[in-house]
Amino acid sequence: WYKFANSLKLRMAMRTCYVAGFNVNGKTSQQLAEEAVAAGVMTAATDGAYRKVADHNPWQRFMVLWSDARISADLTCYMNAYNDPRREAYYDKSTFGTVSGNAYTGEESYVGLRRGILQGQYNSWSQGSSCMKVTTSDNIVVFRASEVAFLRAEGALRNWNMGGTAKDFYEEGIRLSFEENGITSGVENYLASTGKVEAYKDPLKGQSAQTYDYSGAINTNVTVAWSGGDFEKSLEQIITQKWIANFP
């Protein structure tokens, strides 16, 4: 609980860093963040905080049992571009592979549901998209050590005393996320990845009645491999990987 409280303090301090004049009892966001780290935050995958499910995991209920939601196309576009091994832990492969003319094969058979899908196409289109892997008894994620590492990476990028460099904490966050999701290989290749995110591809392209343009264009050129140098680009890398690691 002590590590959890300090980790939460670090998260709150980081979220206030852009608030002009912010302070608590005269302490700035930087001072509060440095206090939290010095007092001890979550550093190991086993430090993570989870809520035990008393009856039925809600993600399983509406994702699997009710089949009312699917993985976001935004997430799969990033993870496919980075050839992310965590896909197999996060969600299953789509069923579009059985559709004639489907462009998705092999590792690219992870297909998310884009925003703005027509309600009338629910059964014929959205049901084929990748679904979250979750069971009725899975615990609910509250706070993971990987997020703490990314928070420390952001702090270090701002030249706050986080106990290490932005690059080291960034890469540690990715390693912790792999461990938290049971992925035992591929992390070094992932850390060296220079793949860039591409626009969403319609898995049913060529079938005019079910082909959609995606207005949610992805505008980024960040890679997984740490670039260093430019503050905004490094910050985008940290936030992108934190977003992926914080699934769901």
PLM segments and residue spans:
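Structured, solvent-exposed acidic/aromatic patches
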Residues: 1-186, 228-236, 241
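C-terminal functional modules
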Residues: 178-248
